Amino acid sequence: MEIINLGKAEGLPPVDWAAVAGKLDSGSAPAPDGANSRTTWLSTVNEDGSPHVTAVGALWLDGTFWFQTGAGTRKGRNVARDPRCSIAASIRDTDVVIEGDATRVTEPGALARIAKAWADNGWPAQPDDSGPGITAPFNAPSQGPPPWNVYRVEPRSAIVTLGTEPGGLTRFRF
């Protein structure tokens, strides 16, 4: 991993990736209270090259972000055509942007595991019997009907801002 301290000129130390990963591991699901709730934001590339940013219920599991969407949604069409994307999240005192490629997940064991992770975090997802996707009694209205495709975003790089002492701004290349 390459570590680039973007806050060096201001005398800030580099952010510790292990600490960031630990926060993501313990807190990537939204909290039920307003003080600790958070949203993850997915940025994809439109056909004309412009960015498309939308909120998603992404989870951090096994060192990567996972999200789901309907095949006919703009984000679904965008990642099918061009997998480059980023996911941004604020986890307590840390802002994280992960950049990578969205890879559609179709392996039944992986779908079952991520569906269980979503269910364990309050969204009753389960693998869909009709094919390589997931289903649930509800989803965001813009997702369209189930089944929904699941994507994994393997980090290629990350930018992390630490908002509490000692502060920090660091880019990581994996």
Question: Which residues make up each language-model segment?
Answer:
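Charged, gly/pro-rich active-site loop segments
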Residues: M1-A19, T94-F174
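An N-terminal domain-cap segment
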Residues: G11-V56
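Short linear motifs in intrinsically disordered
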Residues: G27-G34, K75-N78, P141
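Short beta-strand segments
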Residues: S37-A71, R77-V79, C85-A89, V96-D101
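Short histidine-centered beta-strand/loop micro-motifs
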Residues: Q68-T69, R77-A80, P141-Q143, L162-G163
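A generic structural signal for alpha-helix starts
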Residues: T73-R74, G109
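Short, intrinsically disordered, mixed-charge
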Residues: A80-C85, K116, D120
